């Protein structure tokens, strides 16, 4: 038995376990004030409002997904309008979207990712700039310029994130992967390369691994293969193989163990199917269910139990819709009606603050 008081130290031996009778206070601070990353280190994060521990690869949050659950939809278009709107829903409760704020400009064919606190949107089209905007998800308001751009300007890029790092991948005529550290602004750095140039793609994460959907490259047909990366370490993507077929325009979401590919088109025909893939095994995606309407390039987000797929395009250029589907991610089956977006919109993108790439136990 060892009694621990204020400023007490142990000069030899080790403590295999510690029972605290009254109070135990770990180090605390913001994300930027985390202690040295040693396996087993504990920390209370003021940004995420939860206990974290370092598992040897990354900081993991403990049981904080239930305190969040907001999904955002960024921009998009409906002939002839180009939208700057940011709308949101609370995933746990059904209903229509509400206005959150606005991007720095009207845009379509961008993509976005989020951690527990920030949502980030990249690429403005048709201005075709590599601009990055961000918002604080818990509080509404207009987007703020990130302070750095993608290293390449490419619409229809893929996007995915863990709790600390966000990834933009590919896009029109490029295979470049960029990353940002989400807790700090003004950074965007080369990460590596996809196995081939991909556009009209999306991505999802587990707490360690990112998967980028097949996509295509104009004017050629869609790719059959999919890539994956280890988000915590820079480097080129690794080819998985043909796991979903030749599909562009899918929207992705994930639990902590599986990723989902929703909708898309091949070739030029919109699809309603939802497929599920176990992220750790990187095996073929299996049929999970169907959207209520075949479409592509909508906005997706999820919490631990439910995903939403908002709006999308049934046929280009004048086939945008305003429906929102709800998907139970624990059981296979078709979607149910969730509500409606404020207007018909396609070539949009979505994020949530409680997806499977953020950990949580």
Where on the chain are the PLM-derived regions?
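Polar, enzyme-active/binding microenvironments
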Residues: 1-361
């Amino acid at each position: 038995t060892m009694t621990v008081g204020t400023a007490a130290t142990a000069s030899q031996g080790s403590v295999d376990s510690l029972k605290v009778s009254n109070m135990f206070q770990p180090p605390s601070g913001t994300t930027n004030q985390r202690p040295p990353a040693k396996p087993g280190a504990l920390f209370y994060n003021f940004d995420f409002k939860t206990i974290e521990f370092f598992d040897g690869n990354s900081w993991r949050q403990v049981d904080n997904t239930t305190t969040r659950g907001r999904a955002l939809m960024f921009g998009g278009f409906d002939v002839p309008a180009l939208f700057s709107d940011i709308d949101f829903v609370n995933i746990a409760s059904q209903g229509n979207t509400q206005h959150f704020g606005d991007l720095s400009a009207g845009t379509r064919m961008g993509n976005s990712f989020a951690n527990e606190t920030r949502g980030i949107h990249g690429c403005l089209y048709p201005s075709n700039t590599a601009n990055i905007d961000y918002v604080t998800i818990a509080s509404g308001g207009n987007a703020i310029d990130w302070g750095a751009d993608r290293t390449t300007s490419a619409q229809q890029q893929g996007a995915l994130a863990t709790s600390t790092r966000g990834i933009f991948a590919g896009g029109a005529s490029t295979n470049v992967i960029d990353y940002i550290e989400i807790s700090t602004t003004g950074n965007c750095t080369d990460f590596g390369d996809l196995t081939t140039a991909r556009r009209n793609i999306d991505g999802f994460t587990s707490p360690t691994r990112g998967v980028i959907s097949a996509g295509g490259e104009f004017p050629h047909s869609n790719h059959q293969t999919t890539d994956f990366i280890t988000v915590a370490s820079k480097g080129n993507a690794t080819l998985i193989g043909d796991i979903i077929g030749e599909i562009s325009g899918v929207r992705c979401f994930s639990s902590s163990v599986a990723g989902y590919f929703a909708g898309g088109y091949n070739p030029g025909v919109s699809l309603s199917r939802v497929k599920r893939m176990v992220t750790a095994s990187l095996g073929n995606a299996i049929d999970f269910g169907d959207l209520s309407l075949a479409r592509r390039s909508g906005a997706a987000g999820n919490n631990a139990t439910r995903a939403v797929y908002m709006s999308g395009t049934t046929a280009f250029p004048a086939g945008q819709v305003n429906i929102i589907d709800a998907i139970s991610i624990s059981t296979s089956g078709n979607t149910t009606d969730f509500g409606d977006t404020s207007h018909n919109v396609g070539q949009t993108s979505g994020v949530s603050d409680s997806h499977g790439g953020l950990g949580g136990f």
